[in-house]
Regions:
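Ribonuclease/tRNase effector modules and their secretory precursors
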Residues: 1-113
Length: 113
């Protein structure tokens, strides 16, 4: 099952904490931003105990590396909670959603809000 959410045009919200956090996974902000704006597949949606919605998306960096990104929206901006290289299971889910093993998409699968 995939979920759709419009990222909007408010950009990304970064601070020292989440920049440091993704750096521990060998990532930079540009990697994560590209993964979320370059035809990602959103594979999970949940609401935290505090009521904040969270999405889990898988998308490619500019070099084709697939990332798993947990994110939310605060105001008009995307706030990345964490990001790291996608596990094989998520890579397979991404490829399947894109229409094949190589991720080449013919059409996106149906989405649910």
């Amino acid at each position: 099952m995939t979920y759709m959410h419009n990222l909007g045009d408010g950009g990304f919200e970064w601070d020292a904490s989440n920049v440091t956090h993704i750096a521990r996974h060998g990532l930079q902000t540009g990697d994560v931003e590209h993964a979320l704006t370059n035809d990602p597949v959103t594979v999970h949606y949940a609401v935290t105990d505090s009521g904040e919605p969270r999405w889990v998306s898988v998308g490619p960096t500019s070099t084709g590396r697939l990332l798993m990104v947990v994110w939310t929206v605060r105001g008009a901006r995307v706030r990345v909670v964490t990001a790291y290289p996608a596990a094989r299971r998520l890579q397979a889910a991404y490829a399947k959603a894109k229409g094949g093993r190589d991720g080449a998409s013919k059409t996106d699968p149906p989405v649910q809000d």
